[in-house]
């Protein structure tokens, strides 16, 4: 049985551990002993300590907040370890490709819902239809639109805030552009069967798709319940976003709403937590 190490025992890490535990020997490393099999603070660890830990496992999975994600990925590549990363890091991991090839390290980065699954679908649409445009629309939202801010906490709130503050990259006329996610000129409205009207904002989730050859227009739009963006812009403005989302947004049933479209095809997925 293969040995798998998950770095980070938070909301993502604990679900991954549960999903993999039937088929692999899984251990979780975290600085919090209440969630960790191995108490390990990757932010404070040095290169030797990280190598010593990574050498015990066949695969490393990074499930850390974005500000911590790059360091273990870098050490995995330098060490020749195989690594899958889910963190929404601001760094561009593609700069490590040459080192990874040299050290025979297999790395999959941005392996979440979006970026991640959405990128795979967009890549398949591009290969199949050779489209002029691809638009990714995706959101994790509350099943109940009356939940405060229409949101359910399912991942790191500090990283969630980055979706609204990090400039969003998109492709227009074949060239990379930037826009502020909270610029209301670029907000949009969207409808799905049996779901109240949603609103969308441009977010920085294209990642590897920014280098995709073919489409002249590429964008990712994050979906939220109606009224969410106006409220969030106020929270960001008065620096209370993290506090209010943690306090007000309950742990209830969420759902994923995704639509990826191009000139000749549309893929729609609605997945509700049971």
Residue spans for each PLM region:
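Conserved Rossmann-fold cofactor-binding substructure of NAD(P)-dependent oxidoreductases
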Residues: 43-56
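Hydrophobic/small residue at the entry helix of a nucleotide-binding pocket
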Residues: 12
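Beta-loop-alpha module in the N-terminal Rossmann-like domain of NAD(P)-dependent dehydrogenases
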Residues: 59-76, 89-92
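Conserved N-terminal Rossmann-fold NAD(P)-binding element of oxidoreductases
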Residues: 4-8
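A short helix->loop->beta-strand "cap" motif at the edges of active sites that frequently abuts
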Residues: 79-82, 103-105
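Rossmann-fold NAD(P)-binding glycine/threonine-rich loop
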Residues: 87-109
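NAD(P)-binding Rossmann-fold cofactor-contacting core
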Residues: 24-39
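C-terminal catalytic/substrate-binding lobe primarily of soluble NAD(P)-dependent oxidoreductases
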Residues: 127-274
């Amino acid at each position: 049985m293969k040995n798998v190490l998950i770095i980070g025992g938070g909301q993502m890490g604990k679900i991954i551990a549960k999903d993999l535990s039937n088929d692999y020997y899984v251990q979780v490393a975290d600085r919090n002993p209440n969630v960790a099999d191995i108490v390990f603070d990757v932010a404070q660890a040095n290169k030797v300590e990280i190598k010593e830990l990574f050498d015990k496992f066949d695969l490393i999975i990074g499930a850390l907040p974005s500000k911590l994600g790059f360091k273990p990925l870098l050490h995995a590549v330098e060490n020749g370890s195989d690594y899958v990363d889910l963190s929404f890091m601001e760094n561009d991991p593609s700069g490590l490709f040459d080192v990874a090839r040299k050290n025979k390290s297999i790395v999959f980065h941005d392996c979440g819902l979006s970026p991640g699954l959405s990128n795979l679908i967009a890549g398949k649409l591009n290969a199949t239809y050779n489209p002029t445009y691809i638009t990714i629309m995706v959101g994790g939202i509350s099943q109940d639109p009356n939940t405060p801010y229409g949101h359910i906490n399912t991942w790191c709130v500090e990283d969630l805030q980055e979706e609204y503050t990090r400039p969003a990259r998109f492709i227009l006329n074949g060239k990379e552009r930037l826009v502020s996610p909270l610029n209301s000129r670029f907000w949009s409205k969207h409808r799905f069967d049996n779901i109240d009207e949603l609103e969308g904002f441009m977010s920085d989730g294209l990642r590897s798709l920014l280098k995709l050859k073919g489409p002249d227009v590429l964008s990712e739009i994050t979906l939220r319940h109606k009224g969410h963006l106006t409220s969030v812009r106020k929270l960001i403005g008065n620096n209370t976003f993290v506090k209010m989302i943690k306090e007000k947004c309950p742990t209830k049933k969420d759902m994923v709403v995704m639509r990826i479209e191009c000139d000749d095809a549309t893929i729609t997925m609605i997945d509700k937590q049971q």
